[in-house]
Regions:
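Enzymes that bind and transform nitrogen-containing heteroaromatic metabolites
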Residues: 1-174
Length: 174
């Protein structure tokens, strides 16, 4: 199974405020859909609740410590090891967040699809900094704000070198 993180974050690493996104970027939503459709997606309860529903044409898996939590259209598991066990037959799994889920998988994913939003808003949810000694930038597209995208933004694709990925993944979740 290949783990890939997909996230939109501001230059100051903010990804959200009050359990929601701070910006609207139509191009980012289109990229998200193109990359994740047909694959499994893994997220925490708050992320699922902020989306309001399971996403179509994807296997939705939600991690929640609340045994009574129900997510229509999604499979709910109590923790990360159970999620990985459930998803072990999947070729690729996209990690959607939120903040604590990103932190758990940050050094365990082999790819990172980052939409860097060129602003620095206040927020209450963050991603970790990208360590250039571990993450290799393999693709970049810069875009300007327009009528459908309120801020300048960049699509940044990173690869986590395999030696680090294998060691980190093998030692994780034990």
């Amino acid at each position: 199974m290949e783990l890939a993180i997909i996230v939109a974050a501001a230059e100051n690493h903010v990804i959200g405020r009050d359990n929601g996104l701070i910006w609207h970027l139509s191009a980012d939503l289109k990229r998200f859909k193109a990359l994740t459709t047909g694959h499994a997606i893994l997220m925490g309860r708050k992320t699922f609740e902020s989306m309001g529903r399971a996403l179509p044409n994807r296997r939705n898996v939600v991690i929640s410590g609340n045994p009574g939590f129900v997510a229509p259209g999604a499979e709910v598991v109590p923790d990360i090891p159970k999620a990985l066990e459930l998803l072990k037959g999947e070729e690729r799994v996209f990690v959607l967040g939120g903040g604590s889920i990103y932190r758990e998988f940050w050094d365990k994913a082999s790819q990172l699809y980052l939409t860097e939003v060129h602003t620095s808003p206040e927020g209450d949810t963050f991603i970790p900094a990208i360590d250039p000694d571990k993450w290799e930038l393999i693709g970049r597209e810069d875009h300007y704000a327009d009528e459908k995208n309120e801020f300048d933004y960049s699509f940044l694709d990173y690869r986590y070198p395999k030696i680090f990925f294998r060691i980190a993944f093998d030692r994780s979740f034990r």
